[in-house]
Amino acid sequence: YGAPTEFRSLGQINEGTIVPLGLANAIDQDDLYVEMTFARVMDTVGLDATTEQYGEMFRDSKYSLWHANAGARRNLSRGIKAPMSGHPDFNVHANDIDFQIESDFVGLMTPGLPQASNHYADRVGRVMNYGDGLYGGMLFGAMYAAAFFETDPHRVVEQGLLAIPAESGYARLVRDVLAWHAQDPADWRKNWRRIEEKWNRGDPCPDGVRVYPAWVPWA
């Protein structure tokens, strides 16, 4: 679903049927090969690998990158080590969605253990992201871990919320989505408009990608 529609419906609903297309080049997708790099760090360095060690292997990668990932690798190549490679003082994309699309591997490696997922996500995600950019990955990693044994989607999201600061913008957004869904469970368009009106604000990403609505696929 992602590649054919990415960035094409910013601020508007894309009505009609979306036909899923098989990817002939799945291995060339950044939300796969970046994860493989960090998984290799766990395999070669060990589960106690530090954020700096994750950054070192990421720095030496040769594949294509964008946004926070690209900014982090440039920083690392210039001698700015992780976690500062993902800090907004050095990476203008620190609030972007990069770690969120890559954090599922952490949850898949920690089935039923969202706290353990959060431990690793906090180390890995700081290579390229910060703040809400980091929290998105922590939340999704924890939800993947919780979903191995929890079948109620609402409870899965609640487990994810426990992984991030309650006062963060990301957590407040998710709580809004849960509350609005409880009010109007059958009207996703109404809830989508609520998200747009409250949360689709200017984002620091210099490319102008408005990421907040994309963070709530369950809305």
What is each of the regions a protein language model found here?
Residues Y1, T5, G11-I13, F99, ...:
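Long, well-ordered alpha/beta core segments of mature domains
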Residues Y1, W66-A72, V174-A179, A186:
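N-terminal, motif-rich segments that launch catalysis or mediate targeting to/interaction with membranes
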Residues Y1-E35, Y54:
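An N-terminal structural lobe/cap that precedes and organizes the functional/catalytic core
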Residues Y1-T17, M128-F149, H154-R155, A219:
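Catalytic phosphate/nucleotide-handling subdomain of diverse soluble enzymes
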Residues N14, I18, R40, E56-R59, ...:
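Short, surface-exposed, charged/polar-biased interaction segments
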Residues A24-E35, A39-Y130, L134, F149, ...:
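Active-site cavity-forming subdomains of large catalytic enzyme subunits
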Residues M36-T37, M138, W215-V216:
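A generic alpha-helix surface/boundary motif
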Residues S77, M84-A94, S103-L113, D122-V127, ...:
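Accessory "access/gating" subregions that flank catalytic or transport cores
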